[in-house]
Amino acid sequence: MDKYIIKQNTKGQYQVIKEGNKRATAVFENERDARDYALERRTIANEKELDRKRSGRAILNFFIGILGLAIGLVVGFIGGNSYLNLEDNHNEPGIISTDVFSIHFLELGNEYTGDSIYIKAGGNDILIDAGSRGNSAQAICEYVDDYCEDGILEYVIATHAHQDHIAGFVGTSNIPGIFDYYKCETIIDFPLTNASTKVYNEYVLKRDAEVKNDGAKHYTALECYNNEDGAKKTYEIGDGITMSILYNYFYDHETSDENDYSVCVLFNDGVNNYLFTGDLESEGEEKLVEYNDLPQCKVFKAGHHGSKTSSSIKLLEVIKPEIVCVCCCTGSDEYTDDNAIMFPSQPFIDRVAKYTDLIYATTIVSNNEERFKSLNGNIVVSLKDGVVTVNCSNNNVILKETDWFKKNRTWPADGK
């Protein structure tokens, strides 16, 4: 069976090279197109129809042809180049293998800022949030389908009740939401909210239907933290990999700031830590530090899309992040006309720069018809052989080296 290698050249382009050949068979500007081409070049055998577990899935994909012989996908960095090897190392059809543990910060298919993070840990598929709008469900599902071979999300976490974090769970009138498209086994969400919006009420209806009709388990983050009613504070999600629900003071104390109700999650691979705090604001972060013994973190999902009010000094001086991933539409005036505090904001940069310059952002505002385009694109943080690497679907350029940053932001003198 043929094997194709995807190698990034000195121009940042992605070359698809058939094993044994010296010349590239094709060259692409982004990794996703290169991978799709490589997959198409493989011999397709025993094509089958995939039995979609949810009726809503047929709206997006009536039938999916799947490879009879499994496709192995290995992404690594060798000599500064990115490689994608397609090998036969699975027995089940339609599987794109990943590293032992991978975190995917997703683009959301529109110009609006929001969060959706897909995590693959062994055989477990995890989704944290599903922003930014209902139509984002299509982009999320199309991406996750490349990795989730059985149509089941073992864990779904909704951090808080804002549209840019939950609308994709609901979907639209013609795009099925996450709860329609996938079978969700365990749903963890926020204990408190002030929300009464249409999208929140629809989220509750869809969530509860998933429990009633499909047997999902639903727990609040507080139940998880307290190990109550079958919920767990720490879940074993892979060989030596854990997912822990941290205590947030605002799980059981009311606040006027919806963001501070965010569910906070810490992953650990036995060596490295990965922190997700939703849109937790500075007050919530201070409480998080006070009530939890937080470790140094290899990866931190930037609080509240890189806003001026999150990623506070008190949190950063404890977790000392090495890699920071920002889920936002960079430079968008969606929330403000003040350039300095558009996501990712200058105050955020000033605070984070002390610890790392490995900052990545998913999307950027654009004057094109869609009003957005990829900055780094889908950001994938992978663990393989004990090494954590970052590989993005558009490019691997760190934020401070982008044209947007050079025109709109300043790197502080004491920055890395």
Name the predicted role of every residue range.
Residues 51-68:
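N-terminal Sec-pathway targeting helices
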Residues 28-46:
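A short, charged, amphipathic alpha-helix used as a generic interaction element across diverse proteins
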Residues 82-152, 221-296, 371-416:
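Core dinuclear metal-dependent hydrolase active-site scaffold
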